[in-house]
């Protein structure tokens, strides 16, 4: 069995949630919440996680409007993805993240408000990554095949 390592990112204006998957590529879990400083520091922090986890790909949540169109925040995230692509050597994919933060909040409902604030972004990143992993599994596309495509997909 091949080991799989993919990172999921929930990119917000103040924080970036980071998630990773288990070696089988079946289960995503939160890793860290990066408090945003500036673009260089943000990219360095993500690059650190890519190196630490030996990530083969990065999945970024793309916040579409409820009608499926891309709004200003989605365009900012695509721009962030383009900046990230310049400093890493792994493919980047995007997945629709509509309501992932709402789902994350519900999942953390029993956690104290202070702890929830610290965890919500990484939980949203885990939801984004889990969705990506599940889509590949449902399409009968092994995660490794998806990684081998090495493209930036902005149409999803």
Curated annotation (Swiss-Prot):
Source species of the chain: Gloeobacter violaceus (strain ATCC 29082 / PCC 7421)
What name is this protein filed under?
A: Putative pre-16S rRNA nuclease
- Give one GO molecular function term: nuclease activity
- Write down the top EC class of this protein: hydrolase
Q: Which Pfam families does this one have?
A: RuvX
| Single Gene Ontology BP annotation | rRNA 5'-end processing
In which domain of life is the source organism classified? Bacteria
Mind naming one GO cellular-component term on file for this protein?
cytoplasm
Localization (cell): Cytoplasm
């Amino acid at each position: 069995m091949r080991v799989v390592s993919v990172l999921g990112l929930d990119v917000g204006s103040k924080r970036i949630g980071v998630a990773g998957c288990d070696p089988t590529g079946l289960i995503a879990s939160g890793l860290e919440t990066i408090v945003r400083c500036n673009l260089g520091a943000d990219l360095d922090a993500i690059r650190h996680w890519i190196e630490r986890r030996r990530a083969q790909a990065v999945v970024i949540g793309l916040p579409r409007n409820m009608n499926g169109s891309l709004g200003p925040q989605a365009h900012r995230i695509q721009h962030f993805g383009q900046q990230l692509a310049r400093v890493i050597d792994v493919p980047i994919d995007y997945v629709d993240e509509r309501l992932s933060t709402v789902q994350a909040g519900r999942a953390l409902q029993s956690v104290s408000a202070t702890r929830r604030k610290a965890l919500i972004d990484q939980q949203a990143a885990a939801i984004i990554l889990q969705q990506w992993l599940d889509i590949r599994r449902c399409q009968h596309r092994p995660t490794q095949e998806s990684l081998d495509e090495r493209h930036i997909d902005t149409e999803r």
